[in-house]
Amino acid sequence: MRKSVIGNHLIDSTVNSDNRYIEYLSQVIGLVLREPSQRANEIAIATANEARRSQEIWRELSTMNASQAKELADRIDFTHLTQIADYLNTSQRGAIFTGLHAGDYLLALLKLRSRLTTPRNIYVLRRKAASNLEARVFSHFDDTDIPIKVVRHGDNKTLSVVRALRKGHFVTALFDLPRSFGKAAELQFLDHAMQMVTGPSELAVMGRADLVPFTSNFYNGQSSACFEQPIRATTVEHTAQKLCDVGSNYIYRNPEQWQHWFHVPEMLGAR
């Protein structure tokens, strides 16, 4: 059994059933956001439902043809999409698309992909093993001029990705992950000192690339997404902290949308 301490409270991160899982999420949310138990439970139920809905989007995309997938992604109301797409299509710099596991992040990336016109490679950083479902979903992002190249954690291809960024190619890597997913640093996240991965920021510094953060929501049957101001990387930790600030501000406004509450105990130091 793994436990994390927040103040004088213990969080049990071993989950054996749906009810136990909701109780666990409720504890995490209540202690981190200092919410009363009823509100924390409401958020826990909502975020668990969001995670299930997100998995269903993956399954749905895997059964669609290209035009159906594009139609689904085009339903997203995407703020600043035209401006960011114009910037990406004309800039010679590499870029890293990064965000949280929240809302319809996958469809947001697909809609962005449909607006890219300059031939580049897109490198997708993934930890999960390859699967037929993944291949079918990523086929909607792939074409001759802008091919998708999946890079697995542990493939020892960091330098290849860095070289690609320096040549102006793109990378997709989300940043709301604990240290078990890669190199991490202690950063301020949700007003707590947490161990957060620094991979996207490290790649941006080494690859002399811009970070392009985005957020996504799904409320009342409508998906929306928004690009944040692109970040010009400086030092790894300073850049990673900027991403954490973007993520914290989003989660404070939309706690029900974030799907990675279950990682918080590890981020706080649970082993």
Task: Describe the residue ranges of each PLM region.
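A structural signal for well-ordered alpha-helical scaffolds and beta->alpha junctions
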Residues: 18-22, 131-134, 197, 240, ...
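Catalytic core of membrane glycerolipid acyltransferases/transacylases, capturing the structured
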Residues: 94-153, 181-183
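Short, contiguous strand/loop micro-motifs
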Residues: 12-13, 71, 125, 148, ...
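Non-catalytic C-terminal accessory region of glycerolipid acyltransferases
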Residues: 94, 114, 155-271
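Short amphipathic alpha-helical segments and helix-helix/interface helices
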Residues: 84-88, 109-114, 137-143, 161-162, ...
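Short acidic-hydrophobic, aromatic-tinged amphipathic segments that line or gate anion-handling sites
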Residues: 76-81, 147-155, 232
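Membrane-anchoring hydrophobic helices of lipid-metabolizing enzymes
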Residues: 1-104, 137-140
